[in-house]
Amino acid sequence: MNIYTETNKNTGRLIQIIGPVVDIAFPAGNVPNIYNAVVISGKNTAGEDMCVTCEVQQLLGDRCVRAVAMNPTEGLMRGMDATDTGTPLMVPVGKTTLGRIFNVLGEPVDNLGPVETEQKLPIHRSAPAFTDLDTRLAIFETGIKVVDLLAPYRRGGKIGLFGGAGVGKTVLIMELINNIAKAHGGVSVFAGVGERTREGNDLYMEMKESGVINESNLSESKVALVYGQMNEPPGARMRVGLTALTMAEYFRDINKQDVLLFIDNIFRFVQAGSEVSALLGRMPSAVGYQPTLATEMGGLQERITSTKDGSITSIQAVYVPADDLTDPAPATTFAHLDATTVLSRGLAAKGIYPAVDPLDSTSTMLQPWIVGDEHYACAQKVKETLQRYKELQDIIAILGLDELSEEDRLLVARARKIERFLSQPFFVAEVFTGSPGKYVALAETIRGFKMVFAGELDSLPEQAFYLVGSIDEVIAKAAALTSK
């Protein structure tokens, strides 16, 4: 791995400023490489010192380069000094990044002082070689029943997380961070790409409350945060995902850990690339997107993978513009996803959390030759039962349960129990639910649903299935309810 070292630097002059894009002239023969970081420094129009880091994107002739700024360019003046660092953007990596918040440049922005690390890595790196990849199809157990049973995640895979505001995306993300730390000894990296600053602040506060970030002992924290919010220049929003990915790669390759990488929101990564592409004068492609859309997306996604040392499993929130799944941005994202987790407002309104829609969520891993016949048959039976219940709901609403056949009444009763049994108390939500969190192993989940279908639990009240972990807790809760 290339650890950052100082190199001989050459200096140029700022000759043109076009919003967040700048042109810089260097001495002939000393033009920086594409993707090199260039630092512009000097006095701004108000006479104050300013420093702007840019990334070289184009070579204009034998002396000039066009670069994209990672900081606001207000106050820059022509003639300012621009120093080539000789390397791409370098960001800190390692255990000292846990519990901290960084910007795209790897600078801490949480007012907790500098990060004590000598190790820095460039954000532009090649994807792992084919010979280093781990091609085994292994399930990544999350301890969340509805995910593990119906739409299992692939170890080293990519998962799309779909859901509107207020349906529990943040809580689900925090539970996954908590579970990977406890069950897999892994760490997480969260990339806030082009989302609201308020949401980033809320997430940080909630992580501190739930113990995912340990403020008194940062080394015990389970996550590093990298933010490039929507008020920042497009260059920062375009590169913040790569900064977070570089930190995650270090944990995978050097610490040999399983890493969870969250990207919220992958659409904003594409959107920022579109803005930069237009500023660089490239001809737009379909719907005004950049002509390099597939290449840019592939460059990020291909680095998210399992190697023989460890894995990076990525969960990406996907915004679908105007609910149009054929839009080039979500359509390009879908090509890379192994699973989709869809959060339903209807389930959240019923108080069933996590509000994962069991019928809309999908996974390429749910195949009998990957998960085994028992798991596959159980998952299909759950989906069939819930689908039939959904079809019967109109009849129930108009005519009532009494008009159904005996067989359908039994199916509805089991479907309602299944719906509630797919809910689960979370560790990070203990303060809200008052119930201790539960991690449920996949084998235990399958055993529970098989008992439901075998009719062993038909006599139990459906409220016994709500917000519990394993099936044994259902039986204990039912006994407690009847004794009352």
Swiss-Prot record:
Annotated GO CC locations: chloroplast thylakoid membrane; mitochondrion; proton-transporting ATP synthase complex
Bilayer disposition of the protein: Peripheral membrane protein
Signal peptide extent: none
PROSITE patterns: ATPASE_ALPHA_BETA
An example Gene Ontology molecular-function term: ATP binding
Enzyme Commission identifier(s): 7.1.2.2
InterPro entries on file: AAA+_ATPase, ATP-synt_VA_C, ATP_synth_F1_bsu, ATPase_a/bsu_AS, ATPase_alpha/beta_chains, ATPase_F1/V1/A1_a/bsu_N, ATPase_F1/V1/A1_a/bsu_N_sf, ATPase_F1/V1/A1_a/bsu_nucl-bd
Binding site for ATP: G163, G164, A165, G166, V167, G168, K169, T170
Membrane-spanning segments: none
GO biological process, one term: proton motive force-driven mitochondrial ATP synthesis
Location relative to the cell: Plastid, Chloroplast thylakoid membrane
Alphabetized HAMAP family for the sequence: ATP_synth_beta_bact
Role, per record: Produces ATP from ADP in the presence of a proton gradient across the membrane. The catalytic sites are hosted primarily by the beta subunits.
Protein name, per record: ATP synthase subunit beta, chloroplastic
